[in-house]
Curated annotation (Swiss-Prot):
Protein name listed in UniProt: Holliday junction branch migration complex subunit RuvB
Family: Belongs to the RuvB family.
A Pfam family per the record: RuvB_N
UniProt catalytic activity: ATP + H2O = ADP + phosphate + H(+)
UniProt cross-references to Gene3D superfamilies, sorted A to Z: 1.10.8.60, P-loop containing nucleotide triphosphate hydrolases, Winged helix-like DNA-binding domain superfamily/Winged helix DNA-binding domain
Residue numbers spanned by region Large ATPase domain (RuvB-L): 13-205
Region ranges (Small ATPAse domain (RuvB-S)): 206-276
Main location: cytoplasm
Annotated GO biological process: DNA recombination; DNA repair
GO molecular function, one term: four-way junction helicase activity
């Protein structure tokens, strides 16, 4: 299997909403750092479906799809994967390519700004190849419309010329598989979403699954870790394998500086406390969000923009990076009137609902 990344995917995406400051990636960010993209993640990715830990139901469905496609000597049906970042959407795509013995071309929707960007990728596909488009909900209208006949009829319709002299030329494409990844499945248009034969959601991982992932990664990195140490890291990883692997590397740093030889529960706990990752996997920004809501808005309900303005954090970052996990563990509730801090969050912060905090 060859992995090819679109050259355009390295072009910085335009994001007018981002501002410098606290919304820079943190230790618990589910999005990969540049270094992780280039080296670490590639090294520790599994290459077979049976080696992929977690997502049991999804694995069963994909195994059936692959077996059926191989029996028919056909390509896989188009697949849409959705869920929070860091759960393995790219890894699954690479595994499918490896298992099917085809190439996987990787790109992201923000890189496909012009029709020629997607056209160049499509016409270079070989039979059975997989085209993986990350953040597919961000495709522009022209690019999306080019994909409709490509997905449905394996045909690329190109307009040549302008005005009255314009004509449409159709180019035959080999049968291929489009895998789209998104954190916002509701943002996809119905015509695009309806062209996927399989639509599957990735869920957050359980602690026992993350423990196995940490143990596997530690073995690949030649790092000694006890099961208790792996569990301590897993417990603070926000249900996300990418974060678990990142925390393992930081705990390994701490162990080496302390001249340790093995990551046990005590050492892992000490290291993660230094990195301000608490027992529930919250970092200082999570706590800032909760404390701001309690201190300034009496626990809510409060709107997202008000939280962003009060914390100095970007609203999109709060919504996409921090809020999903706080909702998952029940620390936040979303109501028609806004976000509300739950009683469980008060308890975790050592407060009663009547108490208030001073912002640190």
């Amino acid at each position: 299997m060859a992995i090819k990344r679109s050259g355009n995917s390295d072009r910085p995406a335009k994001n007018p909403s981002s501002t410098p400051g606290t919304n820079a990636p943190t230790l618990l960010s589910p999005t990969p750092t540049h270094q992780e993209k280039e080296t670490s993640e590639e090294k520790i990715r599994p290459h077979r479906l049976e080696d992929y830990i977690g997502q049991k139901d999804l694995k069963s469905i994909l195994a059936i799809a692959m077996e059926a496609a191989k029996t028919r000597q056909d390509s896989l049906d188009h697949l849409l994967l959705y869920g929070p970042p860091g759960l393995g959407k790219t890894t699954i795509s690479l595994i499918l390519a490896s298992e099917m013995g085809v190439n996987c071309k990787i790109t992201a929707a923000p890189a496909l700004e012009r029709p020629r960007d997607i056209t160049g990728l499509l016409i270079n596909l070989k039979p059975g190849d997989i085209l993986f488009i990350d953040e597919i909900h961000r495709l522009n209208r022209l690019t999306e419309e080019l994909l409709y006949p490509a997905m449905e009829d394996y045909r690329l319709d190109i307009t040549i010329g302008k005005g009255k002299a314009a004509r449409t030329q159709s180019i035959h494409l080999p049968k291929f598989t489009l895998i789209g990844a998104t954190t916002k499945v509701g943002a996809l248009t119905s015509p695009l979403r309806d062209r996927f034969g399989l639509i599957q959601r990735l869920r957050f991982y359980e602690v026992d699954e993350l423990t196995l992932i940490v143990l596997r990664t530690a073995q690949i990195l030649d790092t000694a870790v006890t099961e208790e140490g792996a569990t301590e890291i897993a417990r603070r990883s926000r249900g996300t394998p990418r974060i678990a692997n990142r925390l393992l590397r930081r705990v390994r740093d701490y162990m080496q500086v302390k001249n340790g030889t093995t990551i046990d529960q005590e050492l892992a706990s000490e290291a993660l406390d230094i990195y301000q990752v608490d027992k529930q996997g919250l970092d200082w920004i999570d706590r800032l969000i909760l404390e701001t809501m309690i201190n300034q808005f009496k626990g809510g309900p409060v709107g997202l923009e008000a939280i962003a303005a009060s914390t100095g954090e970007d609203a999109k970052t709060i919504e996409e990076v921090y809020e999903p996990y706080l909702l998952q563990i029940g620390f936040l509730n979303r109501t028609p009137r806004g976000r509300v801090v739950s009683a469980v969050a008060y308890q975790h912060l050592g407060l009663t609902s009547e108490e208030q905090l001073s912002i640190f």
